[in-house]
Amino acid sequence: MTTDDRTLLPLRQKILLGLTILVGLFFLVSYNLGLIDPGKLTLFILFYSFGVTMWLLAFETLVDLDDNRIFFIWLAIGLVQFCFYLLTKDNENFKIYRSPNIDPNSFLNNYISDTTTSSLKTLLIFLIGYKIFNTIMKKLTGNCLLNTYRQMSWSHETIKRKISGLDVVFNLLLFVVIILSALTR
């Protein structure tokens, strides 16, 4: 790898980073200017937060996170999204109204989020989980964590190594982390 190659981000990262930033800015402008119906905007924010993180997990973009430059770019975006979550978690515009038939003291009401912007914490929590699992993976095997979704064989084409059982377990755990962080308070 030449010096010029190390300064460039992979095209898949440029595309995902660009889309993530542009869509996030579009949502911010849309909210402030009232360009999108608030009900639809809250749904879009939920899918946006969940979708970006799932994209990182399911595609070769997960392998790119082993590069600290790329990881810290995503960490900065995750911190910005987390700040927006903190700023909006009590905002009535993003409130989820549940059926009156649901017991207010039930497990569901105690742990499931009551705002759509709670999904904005997903990227940060995912990245923390990724860093922990990738560190464990490197200590145990000497290899970085691979994405196992969409793989048609036990060989990873991008990295050119076999997918291990640990890759699969950590991918499943990261998927659970995404779901839980998107839906819980």
Cite the ranges covered by each PLM segment.
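Membrane-interface segments at the starts/ends of alpha-helical transmembrane spans
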Residues: 5-10, 70, 99-120, 154-163
